UniProtKB/Swiss-Prot annotation:
<feature type="transmembrane region" description="Helical">
    <location>
        <begin position="287"/>
        <end position="307"/>
    </location>
</feature>
<comment type="similarity">
    <text>Belongs to the HAK/KUP transporter (TC 2.A.72) family.</text>
</comment>
<feature type="transmembrane region" description="Helical">
    <location>
        <begin position="421"/>
        <end position="441"/>
    </location>
</feature>
<dbReference type="GO" id="GO:0015079">
    <property type="term" value="F:potassium ion transmembrane transporter activity"/>
</dbReference>
<keyword id="KW-0406">Ion transport</keyword>
<dbReference type="InterPro" id="IPR053951">
    <property type="entry name" value="K_trans_N"/>
</dbReference>
<feature type="transmembrane region" description="Helical">
    <location>
        <begin position="339"/>
        <end position="359"/>
    </location>
</feature>
<keyword id="KW-0630">Potassium</keyword>
<dbReference type="InterPro" id="IPR003855">
    <property type="entry name" value="K+_transporter"/>
</dbReference>
<feature type="transmembrane region" description="Helical">
    <location>
        <begin position="104"/>
        <end position="124"/>
    </location>
</feature>
<keyword id="KW-0472">Membrane</keyword>
<dbReference type="InterPro" id="IPR023051">
    <property type="entry name" value="Kup"/>
</dbReference>
<feature type="transmembrane region" description="Helical">
    <location>
        <begin position="249"/>
        <end position="269"/>
    </location>
</feature>
<keyword id="KW-1003">Cell membrane</keyword>
<dbReference type="Pfam" id="PF22776">
    <property type="entry name" value="K_trans_C"/>
</dbReference>
<feature type="transmembrane region" description="Helical">
    <location>
        <begin position="368"/>
        <end position="388"/>
    </location>
</feature>
<feature type="transmembrane region" description="Helical">
    <location>
        <begin position="396"/>
        <end position="416"/>
    </location>
</feature>
Length: 625
C-alpha cells in the first residue's frame, strides 16, 4: 500500500485499518506478557513480596508508557519520510542533510542490522513461550515442546514464498481476540487483589530500584521485554498511517497489556506459585488448552510480522545501495508489502531453529532477546535528537531535554541487558555486526566501482563525433544502455562499439537512481534530454520503497518525445568482474574479496530491472578496485 494513500484514511476505514494493524504491528509487543513477568520474577535474587511485585509492575507500566506511548506514538511517529517510518527511513530522511552524515548512517545501519537479530529471536522465544503452557496443562508433553516449536517454525518459514495474503485477513481478528482474552484474564487476577493498581504511582518503581540496588538494575533487563516490538509501531507506519496505529494502541493494545500485567502481579501478591509461567496461571484449568492454542496462533502472527518486516527492510537497504541485489518476489497483487526475499528467509530460518534447539527454553532466550532491541531503540533516540534539531528546528536545550530523557532510559535498559552477553546476548550482537559489516563493505565496493567507471568517461558529443569519423555502421532498431554514471557516454556503450563495431540507429542512455524518499510522484519519475539526433539520455528516479521496472518506464519515455521502437529494443548492461588494484590504493584485499563474492551472488541486473531476458546483451569487463 502506498504510504500516501494510507497516511490519512477516510473516517469509515479508520477502524478497519486499526483492526488490520492489530495483526501486523502489535503481534510482538502483544505476546510479551507470555514471558515478561515470569522473566522478571526469575531474575536472580528477585524478591516476591508485595512491595517488590508492585515495584516491578510499576516499572512495566511506566516503561510501556514512556517508551511506547511517549517516545514512539507521540514523537517518533511525527517524523515520517513521506509517510514511511522505521530506522532506515529516518536515516534516509536525515541523510538528506549532509552534516554529520557518517554518524547518521552508522546509527541507522547498525540499528537496522540489529533488527535481523530481533527477527531471528522473536519467532523462537514467542513460539516456545506459548507451547511451554503445555508444561502446566499436560506435564507429560514437556519433552515435545522444543520439537513442536521447531516443526511450527519450519512450517512458518516454508510457506513464506507462497505469501500470506490469503490468511492475512484473519490476523487482525485473531489478535483482537487475543487482546480481549488477555484483558479478561488480567481482570480475573485483579479481582483477587484490586489494590494492585497502586503500582500506577511511579514511586513504587523508583523505590524498588533504589532499595534493591544491583538486583533492581538487573531486573531492568527483564522489564525491558515488555516493550520489545514497540519499534514496529514506527516501522509499519507506511502500511497503515499513524492514525490507525494510534487508535489500535490506545483503544485496545495498551489497556489490554496493562490489565494483564496487573493481573499477573495481583496473582503473585495473592500467593500464587511463581514457578512455571505466571501468565497461564491466570487461566482456569478447563480453558488452559484453548488458551495455549490461541497463544500459539498469536505468536505465529507475531513471528510472521517480524519476518515480513525483515523482508521490507531488506528491500529498503537494497534500494538505498547498502545491500547487494537479491531476488524479491511479489507474493500478492493486493499490497506492495507482500514480498518474499528467499535469501533472508532461509538465513532467518537457520538461525531461528538453531536458537530454539540450542537454548531450549524461553527463559534462556530472554537473555539474548533484549540486548538487540534495546540498542536499536537507543540509536532511534539518537536519530530523533537530530530530527528535533534539523527538522523541527528545536533549540538545543529543548531537543536535549526531551531526547535526553529517552537516551537516559534507553541507555539504562541497554546497560542492564549488556550484563546478559555471556548468557546469549552475544548472538544478536554477532549477527548484527556481521550484517553491518557486509552492508558497509558492499557500499564501499559499489562506490569504488562507480568511481573507476567515472575515470573512463568521455563526453557523448565526443563519442558521437568519433563514431561519425570512423564511419561505424548503424543498424536498425533501438539500443538502451544502462549506466550508473551521471554524465558522459556509458562504458558499456564504448565496449559495445569496440567489440561489435556497429551501433543502433536510435540510442537511449538510461540511468536509474534511487533517492532517500519512499515514493516518487509520476510527474517526477523521468527526465529526458536529447543529446544528438536520435540520441537521448534519460534519468529515472525511484523511491526506496519502489521497484524499478524498465520496460514500463520506456513506455513513458516514448510519450515524452523519445522516438524509440518499443517492439525492437536491445538492452545493453555491463557486468564488472572485480579484481584488486595493483597500486595499493584500493580496498583492502579481504574487503575486495568479500565484495566480489557478494557481487557474483547478487541478482542479475536484468532481473532486478525486469528486463526481458531474450532482449538483453551483457558485456563484461574487469574493474580493479
Amino acid at each position: 500500500m502506498n504510504a500516501n494513500l494510507a497516511h490519512q484514511p477516510p473516517q469509515g476505514r479508520l477502524s478497519l485499518l486499526a483492526l488490520s494493524a492489530l495483526g501486523i504491528v502489535f503481534g510482538d509487543i502483544g505476546t510479551s506478557p507470555l514471558y515478561t513477568f515470569k522473566t522478571i520474577l526469575g531474575t536472580g535474587g528477585q524478591p516476591t513480596g508485595a512491595a517488590a511485585v508492585l515495584g516491578a509492575l510499576s516499572l512495566v507500566i511506566w516503561t510501556l508508557f514512556i517508551i511506547t506511548t511517549v517516545k514512539y506514538v507521540m514523537f517518533a511517529m511525527r517524523v515520517d519520510n513521506d509517510g514511511e517510518g522505521g530506522i532506515l527511513a529516518l536515516m534516509a530522511l536525515l541523510g538528506v542533510k549532509r552534516q554529520r552524515r557518517p554518524t547518521i548512517v552508522a546509527l541507522g545501519l547498525f540499528g537496522a542490522a540489529l533488527i535481523y537479530g530481533d527477527g531471528a529471536i522473536t519467532p523462537a522465544i514467542s513460539v516456545l513461550s506459548a507451547l511451554e503452557g503445555l508444561n502446566m496443562a499436560a506435564p507429560a508433553l514437556q519433552p515435545y515442546v522444543v520439537p513442536a516449536a521447531v516443526v511450527i517454525l519450519l512450517a512458518l518459514f516454508a510457506i513464506q514464498s507462497r505469501g500470506t495474503a490469503s490468511i492475512g485477513r484473519l490476523f487482525g481478528p485473531v489478535m483482537l481476540l487475543w487482546f480481549v482474552t488477555i484483558a479478561v484474564l488480567g481482570l480475573v487476577g485483579i479481582a483477587r487483589h484490586p489494590t494492585v493498581f497502586a503500582a500506577i504511582n511511579p514511586s513504587y518503581g523508583l523505590s524498588y530500584l533504589v532499595s534493591n540496588g544491583a538486583t533492581g538494575f538487573l531486573v531492568l533487563g527483564s522489564v525491558f521485554l515488555c516493550v520489545t516490538g514497540a519499534e514496529a509501531l514506527y516501522a509499519d507506519m507506511g502500511h497503515f498511517g499513524a492514525g490507525p496505529i494510534k487508535l489500535a494502541w490506545f483503544a485496545v493494545v495498551f489497556p489490554s497489556l496493562i490489565i494483564n500485567y496487573a493481573g499477573q502481579a495481583a496473582l503473585v501478591i495473592d500467593g500464587a506459585p511463581t514457578d512455571g509461567n505466571i501468565f497461564f496461571r491466570l487461566c482456569p484449568d478447563g480453558l488452559l488448552l484453548p488458551l495455549i492454542g490461541l497463544a500459539t496462533l498469536a505468536t505465529i502472527i507475531a513471528s510472521q510480522s517480524v519476518i515480513t518486516g525483515a523482508f521490507s527492510m531488506t528491500r529498503q537497504a537494497i534500494q538505498l545501495g547498502w545491500m547487494p541485489r537479491l531476488a524479491i518476489k511479489q507474493t500478492s497483487s493486493e499490497g506492495y508489502g507482500q514480498i518474499y526475499v528467499g535469501a533472508v528467509n532461509w538465513l532467518l530460518m537457520l538461525v531461528t531453529v538453531s536458537l530454539t534447539i540450542g537454548f531450549g527454553k524461553s527463559d534462556n532466550l530472554a537473555s539474548a532477546y533484549g540486548i538487540a532491541v534495546s540498542l536499536t531503540m537507543l540509536m532511534t533516540s539518537a536519530l530523533l535528537f537530530i530530527a528535533m534539531r534539523e527538522i523541527w528546528q528545536w533549540s538545543l536545550l529543548a531537543a536535549g531535554a526531551v531526547a535526553g530523557v529517552f537516551l537516559t532510559i534507553d541507555s539504562a535498559f541497554f546497560l542492564a541487558n549488556l550484563t546478559k552477553i555471556a548468557e546469549g546476548g552475544y548472538v544478536p550482537l554477532l549477527l548484527a555486526t556481521s550484517v553491518y559489516g557486509l552492508m558497509w563493505i558492499w557500499h564501499r565496493g559499489a562506490a569504488a566501482v562507480a568511481e573507476r567507471m567515472r575515470e573512463r568517461l568521455i563526453p557523448v558529443a565526443q563519442f558521437m563525433a568519433d563514431i561519425a569519423e570512423k564511419k561505424v555502421p548503424r543498424v536498425p532498431g533501438t539500443a538502451v544502455f544502462l549506466t550508473r554514471t551521471e554524465r558522459g557516454a556509458p562504458p558499456v556503450m564504448l565496449w559495445h562499439v569496440k567489440h561489435n563495431r556497429a551501433l543502433h540507429e536510435h540510442l537511449l542512455v538510461l540511468r536509474v537512481e534511487v533517492i532517500s524518499i519512499p515514493w516518487v510522484a509520476p510527474d517526477d519519475r523521468l527526465k529526458i534530454e536529447e543529446l544528438a539526433p536520435n540520441v537521448w539520455r534519460a534519468e529515472a528516479t525511484f523511491g526506496f520503497m519502489e521497484r524499478p521496472h524498465i520496460p514500463e518506464l520506456l513506455k513513458a519515455s516514448k510519450a515524452r518525445g523519445c522516438r524509440i521502437d518499443l517492439d525492437d529494443i536491445t538492452y545493453y548492461v555491463g557486468h564488472e568482474t572485480v579484481t584488486a588494484r595493483d597500486d595499493g590504493k584500493g580496498l583492502p584485499a579481504w574487503q575486495e574479496q568479500l565484495f566480489a563474492a557478494m557481487e557474483r551472488n547478487s541478482l542479475h541486473v536484468s532481473d532486478f530491472f525486469s528486463l526481458p531476458r531474450d532482449s538483453v546483451v551483457e558485456i563484461g569487463r574487469q574493474v580493479a578496485i
